[in-house]
Structure formats: C-alpha cells, structure tokens
C-alpha cells in the first residue's frame, strides 16, 4: 500500500504533463479588425462602395468589427497518416457601442484525413463545413473563386504534373421552390438547395517560377421530390477558371480568366444562385432569372520594390450579361504602395477607381477613393500583421443609375432592376457627391 501511495504523485504528475502537452497542441488561428472612425460632415465613419460593384477598396474604408476565431487540433497521427479537426466561428458588429450582441456564424467544422489512401500518397480526404481553397484579392476583399460551405472532397492528388482536387459543396436560397398546397396554388416558401461540384488541377509548372491552375465548377438546384422551381429560375450553370501565378520581385502576380453561365453568374465565384428569392415572402422574385453569361479578366499581386517599398495592385474587368438585361459591366483598378520608415513603421496609400455600367440603362456609376495611413506593424512586409493604423480617406462618386427597391415585387414590376437615377422623379443611386473620413483601426491575422 505504501508503494502504491508513493507512486501516486508520480502518476498524477505524468498524467498532468500528458494533458498539458495535449492542450498545448491545440492550434489557435484567426483574423480580426476593429476601430473607430468619423465622417467629415458629421457622425460615425461612413464607407464608400460603388452601386453595382461587388466589392470596395478596403484600406480606411471598413466600418465594422469583424473576427474569425479558429480552433483546430491534430487528433490522431500514426506515421504519415493523420486526422485534423478544424473549426471557425465568425462575428460581425457595427462597432458603435461597448456591448453589441450578435449571433455567431459557424463557418467551419470539418475533419481532414491525410495520407489515408495508400495508393494516393500525399492526398487529403475531408468532410464538413470548410473554407475550401479560396482565391481572393486582399486589397478589395474580393473572393473570385470560393465554393466554401458544407461539403466533402479529396484534394492534392499527385498526378505527376500537378495536384488534382475533387469536391462537392452546398449553399441554399430562401424560397424559390414549392410544393402543391391546395386550390391549385403553389406556395414558394421552401429553401432551395444548390449543389456545386468542383474539379481543379493546380501546381502545374509551365514556366520558370510560374504555375497554372485550371478548374471547372458545375452548380445546380437540387429539389426535393414533388417540388418545383419558380418559372424562369436559373436551374444550373458552369464556371471555368484559369489562373497563372508568377513569382516576381519577392512577391507574386496572378492573372485570372473566368467564364460562367446561368446560375453561376450571380456571384461569379463558384456558388450557384438564381433559383431562390431574395426577400422572404416575395412569391414573385425579381432575381430568380440569372440566365446569361459572365466574363472576368483579373490581374493582381503584391511585390517588393527594394528595401523600403512594397506594393499591392489590382486590375479587373467583369461583364455579367443577363437575358433579363439586369447585368453589369464593372472594371476596377487600384494600387496600395507602402513605404517602410523602419521595420515596424510605415506609410501606406491606397488609390482605387471603380466604374460600373448598367446593362439595362446604359448609364455608368463611378467612384475614386484615396486613403493615406500611418501604420505600425509586426514586421517589414506589406503582409505583416498585427497592424495599428491611423488613416484619412477621401472618396468622390458620380452615379447615374441605381436599383429600384420601392414597394415590393408584387406591386412594382421594376423591383430590384436597374433604373436611371431620376426614374419616375425618384432618386436612385448615390448621386454626385464626395466625402472624407478619418479614424484608427487595428487588423490582425495569426
């Protein structure tokens, strides 16, 4: 009994050490931004985005507190085989008060198994909700290839000249499909599940320092038995992507060409949309018909121009041509140079211009935005974070058209459609004006 008692403290110490090591193995990653800002004409900070554009230049132009908190752990490993559990919860509030309650968004919960298939060494099999191989332009916070959602797949299959990945994911739209109720009436209240099937071949070395990635995505509305879609709904569509990445000037340049059809044109990033309604209880949806095509040509990157200068840049042309004439032509160009005074202090400027033409009216909306920021960051790279910055932003815009959201889809035949700025004596779009803002912000990823 004495021997047992003497051994007990040692056993407890060993168990505590093992538990401590296991706890330390938890990976904590994430992203966050928050700050305070004012508008020159009074009030809290306003943010500026061109009507019809799918994004905005973000430096000194973000008006919310946003965070993604990721917890993950390798829960099993034997040789080169392993299982990894990953989660991600996101939050967003208006940053106007001390206490701002919000419901979290459960963005990720998945398990990834590596090297589980003997005859596919290096591959990963996965299932669950996941950010899946997302492609974006950081300076405008624009995701041009992103099929994230609940899904499953097999990725990084070595085919000799590249890596092959296969995946299926899902997103849903409110309304848009119906079941027969009574009195020959269809009640369009059921959510429509949209499936996306993704095939991509990446890491193909085609020139010194350059790689090519090709992808095909097919999206379709997946109805329950005995349900039907709203008449004119976009049932399915395709997205084709080619991206060349070149290592250059201690950074990279990406040149991207994408072509989409029908339901894959709305967001243009790989998620199917067009079978559902945009607002609850709108039986006759204004945007169910996304039939048409989209062409996107994009070039963006980040480079180093010597010891003291870094720069991000983007140039993009996007043409969404819909059969219902409610599409847009959007082109944007911008730069973000950074001068490093010391390894942890820099001055950053962002200049961006957007121009969006309405397919329906032929009118154009345009905006240019300039931000100057003094920044302190954890390192001497334009990608170094965390960063604390003070900024001043000036924006000027001239908008000739806007979207008509007066009334509802039942009473307004133009609901959700592009109309001239002075349509029916109204005031659509943001008109011709300018504004400036100033403030401070922190941004971090880890």
UniProtKB/Swiss-Prot annotation:
Recorded topology in the membrane: Multi-pass membrane protein
Site feature (Important in sugar transport) residues: 143
GO molecular-function terms, A-Z: maltodextrin transmembrane transporter activity; maltose transporting porin activity
Disulphide bridges, residue numbers: none
Key words of the record: Cell outer membrane, Ion transport, Membrane, Porin, Signal, Sugar transport, Transmembrane, Transmembrane beta strand, Transport
Quaternary structure and partners: Homotrimer formed of three 18-stranded antiparallel beta-barrels, containing three independent channels.
Name of the molecule in the record: Maltoporin
Species annotation: Escherichia coli (strain SMS-3-5 / SECEC)
């Amino acid at each position: 009994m004495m021997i047992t008692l003497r051994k007990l403290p040692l056993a407890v110490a060993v168990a505590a050490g093992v538990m401590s090591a296991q706890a330390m193995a938890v990976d904590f990653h994430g992203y966050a931004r928050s700050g305070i800002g004012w508008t020159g004409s009074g009030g809290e900070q306003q943010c500026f985005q061109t009507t019809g554009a799918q994004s905005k230049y973000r430096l000194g132009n973000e008006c919310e507190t946003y965070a993604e908190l990721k917890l993950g752990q390798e829960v099993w490993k034997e040789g080169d085989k392993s299982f990894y559990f990953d989660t991600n919860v996101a939050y967003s509030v208006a940053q106007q008060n001390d206490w701002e309650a919000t419901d979290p968004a459960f963005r990720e919960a998945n398990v990834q198994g590596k090297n589980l298939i003997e005859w596919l060494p290096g591959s990963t099999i996965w299932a669950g909700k996941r950010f899946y191989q997302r492609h974006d332009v950081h300076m405008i916070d624009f995701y041009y290839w992103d099929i994230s959602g609940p899904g499953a797949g097999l990725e990084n299959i070595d085919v000799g000249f590249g890596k092959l990945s296969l995946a299926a994911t899902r997103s849903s739209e409110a309304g848009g499909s119906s079941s027969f109720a009574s009195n020959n009436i269809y009640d369009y209240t059921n959510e429509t599940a949209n499936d996306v099937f993704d095939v991509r071949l990446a890491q193909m070395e085609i020139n010194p320092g350059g790689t090519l990635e090709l992808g095909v995505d097919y999206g379709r509305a997946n109805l329950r038995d005995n349900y039907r879609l709203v008449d004119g709904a976009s049932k399915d569509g395709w997205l084709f992507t080619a991206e060349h990445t070149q290592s250059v000037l201690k950074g990279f340049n990406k040149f991207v060409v994408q072509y989409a059809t029908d339901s894959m044109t709305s967001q243009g990033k790989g998620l199917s949309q067009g079978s559902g309604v945009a607002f609850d209880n709108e039986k006759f949806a204004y945007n169910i018909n996304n039939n048409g095509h989209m062409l996107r040509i994009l070039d963006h990157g980040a480079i180093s121009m010597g010891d003291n200068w870094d720069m991000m840049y983007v140039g993009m042309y996007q043409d969404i041509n819909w059969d219902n004439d409610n599409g847009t032509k959007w082109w944007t160009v911008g730069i973000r140079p950074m001068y490093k005074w010391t390894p942890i202090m820099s001055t950053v400027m962002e200049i961006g211009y957007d121009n969006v033409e309405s397919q329906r009216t032929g009118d154009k909306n345009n905006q240019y935005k300039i931000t100057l920021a003094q920044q302190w960051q954890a390192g001497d790279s334009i990608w170094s974070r965390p960063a604390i910055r003070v900024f001043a932003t000036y924006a000027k815009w001239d908008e000739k058209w806007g979207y008509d959201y007066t009334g509802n889809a039942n009473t307004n035949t133009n609901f959700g459609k592009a109309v001239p700025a002075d349509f029916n004596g109204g005031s659509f779009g943001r008109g011709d004006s300018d504004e400036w803002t100033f403030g401070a912000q922190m941004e971090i990823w880890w």
